[in-house]
A protein has these predicted regions:
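Outer-membrane beta-barrel porins/channels
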Residues: 1-184
Length: 184
């Protein structure tokens, strides 16, 4: 077993998320059937950090990658409200969100550091990675299509019990910038 250049310290961190502003409209088609549409504007930022410090090497490598995300997606829904008794209704809900594209503007910086704590005393060289050259400065994230099915039973404005199932087709999700595949 060769211990030369084996990883002594390896750290990973991530933070961020997507915010959403939405507009929804719904209207009745019949006495028991209604239809709705939601338009979402998604925006946010993700940051990913990693640090590798190797035995026998003076400087470790610190990577800071970030993605600014923005884009629209849509959801179409229908609701069937069937009266069973005077104060008892049965509901069926169907919802469909087609696949959509979110735009990602990416940056990546690499640092060398003598410790796993990044501060002015430990920093070595700084390199801003040329993502434009690799075709990764602007990438697209495909939001998978999804279906939501729900049923419920209740007394209007008093009580309600229901169940919902969501089917999301996320097996083809891919983030080329971070080389992350098949995220659910």
């Amino acid at each position: 077993y060769n211990t030369n250049n084996s990883v002594n310290t390896r750290l990973f961190a991530a933070n961020g998320g997507i915010n959403r502003v939405f507009f929804s409209v719904g209207f009745p088609l019949t006495k028991f059937l209604s239809f709705g549409l939601t338009t979402n504007y998604n925006f946010g930022k993700f940051e990913y950090e990693s640090f590798n410090l190797y035995e026998g090497v003076n400087y470790g490598i610190y990577s800071n990658s970030s993605s600014d995300i923005s884009g629209f997606n849509y959801q179409f829904s229908s609701n069937i409200d069937i009266p069973i008794k005077k104060d008892l209704n049965f509901n069926i809900m169907l919802s469909y969100s087609p696949s959509s594209i979110l735009n990602s503007v990416n940056t990546q910086d690499l640092y060398t550091s003598t410790t796993n704590l990044i501060n002015l005393n430990s920093l070595g060289d700084l390199v801003e990675v040329n993502l434009e050259e690799r075709g990764l400065k602007s990438t697209e994230l495909r939001v998978p299509k999804k279906y939501i099915y729900g049923v419920g039973l209740g007394n209007h404005n008093k009580w309600y019990i229901g169940a919902q199932i969501e089917k999301k087709f996320s097996s083809n999700f891919e983030n080329r910038f971070l080389n992350i595949k098949n995220i659910d």
